């Protein structure tokens, strides 16, 4: 509802603008303009130059619009606005604005979608998914640089000479480094040749796995068997020695035993004789007694 209705007047531009310190003074003429009349003076407005920060924002917005290119991409079943915005580094609002989408579900009514990307960005190089939307002119064929054969040969020889010089310098530097390192550290062992295996010097004492197996077999089987066989042979030899000693003692004592038995028999036989005869017999048997 309109509160007050009054006569409408056309836009009247200022007649002059005066700039002062920190402000602008606009002066208008007192003349009245007809309601139905329209002249070009209504649109002849002086262009005011914006100041520092505003001018930078305007330039940035213009550059932003100029650096954006629209690329077209086919829509699949799994696509949505958030996924496309994250994938191509743009805003959902920009995609909606370019494709005239009102809601997020409107994307499924399209077969292809336009995506705003930077002109010289990495996404513009993905030609397998995106195609230029506003490129009406056919791409210009790449111009092949054709150099004369003599110049190409000269360049080839030149680059080969450079490569050879670099290789020689690298070899000399390597030799000098090895010599200086050998002079600075004479006590260090020589460098290990590639492919040559050196024994380890850790907690395993540098032994191999088959050495460990051999030591376990030696300690667990060979030494116990040798110990048992040795003491068994020692026991057999001691038993044989004791039996032989007993046999020798009995053999050495057998003559004396026989002599004693013969003396007893003679004593029993001569028990009926006289004591003098027995004494004579005893003296004959024991001349030293």
From Swiss-Prot:
Keywords of the record: Glycoprotein, Membrane, Transmembrane, Transmembrane helix
Localization, UniProt: Membrane
Subcellular location, principal: membrane
Record domain LysM: where: 71-115
PANTHER family registered for this protein in UniProt: AND PUTATIVE PEPTIDOGLYCAN-BINDING DOMAIN-CONTAINING PROTEIN 4-RELATED, LYSM AND PUTATIVE PEPTIDOGLYCAN-BINDING DOMAIN-CONTAINING PROTEIN
Protein name (Swiss-Prot/TrEMBL): LysM and putative peptidoglycan-binding domain-containing protein 4
Extracellular side: 1-208
The species this protein was found in: Xenopus laevis
Topology with respect to the bilayer: Single-pass membrane protein
Topological domain ranges for the Cytoplasmic compartment: 230-289
Region named Disordered: 1-23, 252-272
Keyword DNA-binding among record annotations: no
Residues passing through the membrane, by range: 209-229
